[in-house]
Structures are given as C-alpha cells and as structure tokens.
Amino acid sequence: MRKNVKQQLALRVLSTAALMAMVSSIATAAFADTYDLNKGSVTVETKEDGFTYVTQLDNTQTDGYARNDKDDILHDYQDKTGVTITSGGEKTSNTITVETAKDQTTDVTLQDVHIETESSWNNTGSAPIEIKGDGDTNLELNGDNTVLSGDSHHAAIEKADKNGHGTLTIKDDLNDDNSTPKDKDENGNAAGGDTGTLLAGGYGNGAGIGGGSSDLADTSNITIKGGKVTARGGCEDGAGIGGGTYGKAKKHPH
C-alpha cells in the first residue's frame, strides 16, 4: 500500500513539473521595467486586448497573460506599471514608437533620453518619437530629455492625424525614481527640484511636438500637463507645438 502511495506521489510531482515546463515554453516573457535605447529602437504597443507589447531588436515582451490555443490563461505576469525608456543621457539615433488602440492607454516614462536622428532633406528618415493610434498615450518626464529630429519631413515628437486621433499627454506626475511626490508646485510638478525636462526640436518642416510635413502635417489632442517643456519648430515654419508646415492643430474627437 505504501509503495502505491509513493508511486502516486511521484507521478503527481512529475505531472506538476511537466505542466510547469509547458507553461514556461508557451509563456511570452514579461517585459523589463527599463529599456536601454542605446541597444536599439523601441516600439511600445497597447492592443485592443488591453495588453502592452514592447519590441526591441526583434524581441517582443508583454505585460499581459500567456495563453494557449484555447485562450486559457496560463500565467499571470506583473501588474501594469508602464514602460521606462532611457539612454542614460547618451546621444543615440535610435527611435521610439508608441501605438495605442482605441479605448486603451499606454504609459511611457522618458528617463534621460537623448535622441538625435540623422540629417535628411529627402524624407528618408523617421521621427525620433512617433505617437500613433486612437488611444491615449502618456509621456512621463524623468530627468533631462532631448529629442531632436534630423529629418525635414518629421517632427521631433510626431503625432500626425494620419496615424490616428488619440491623445498625447506630456506630464511630470512622479519623482525621478517613479515614486509619488508628497508635494507638487503650482504647475502640478513634483516639488523639490525634481522636475523632468524636455527639449523637442523639429527640423525643416516638422514641429517640435505635433505634425511633420505633407500628409503628416495635421495634428490634434496634445496636452502639456507638467514638466519643463521647450519645443521649437523647424526652419521651414513648423510649429513649436502644433502642426508642421501648412498643417493644422485642433482638438479631434476620438
């Protein structure tokens, strides 16, 4: 009898181990807290399922759930805390793309990011930071951030109506260590000299924050809620904050 009990226990242990191995093999890796932009461009996408997927160097990670082909939840990953991207203050030409589906929200923290894309008048480049989709994107400012476009067709932080009518909110709700400040100043920023900064500069036809040129010129639904933000347009009449050359800035229903 004891032998049978031992055999049953052994089988249960083996079955549990096999199940855990299956979960490990099927599960998608949970995303890291912080991404180093020096290692490659980063794409952050919140899809209609409400899960956020982060891709860097063809490696995609998620904050959501791993599922099998029957859509059963296999493993619950970390709570959503948003994504932090940094270059440690070092200049890079790698870019950030944030895309948010309708009725969803993506939270991204810029921590000492310094992006300068290569100079181009042939519209062959890309925006340093591109905001896409019909959902809500929040950019939290930590440390000192510099975003400069080198392409005459693109804004530094580009949010073109062609790519969606969602919202972009730039804010400074948290301390630089992502803790909640005890006090805020009259502008709503973290008090005590912990204000995040942003310098966004367009090039040519692009805005500092907003539209690029041509079919990317129109923009909408941009809010600066906090932080110390300096935005300058390109030399061909791009706005500091607003549309690119000949573009319009407006509040668009989404």
Predicted regions located by residue number:
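A composition-driven surface/loop motif
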Residues: 16, 27-254
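Bacterial Sec-dependent N-terminal signal peptides
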Residues: 1-19
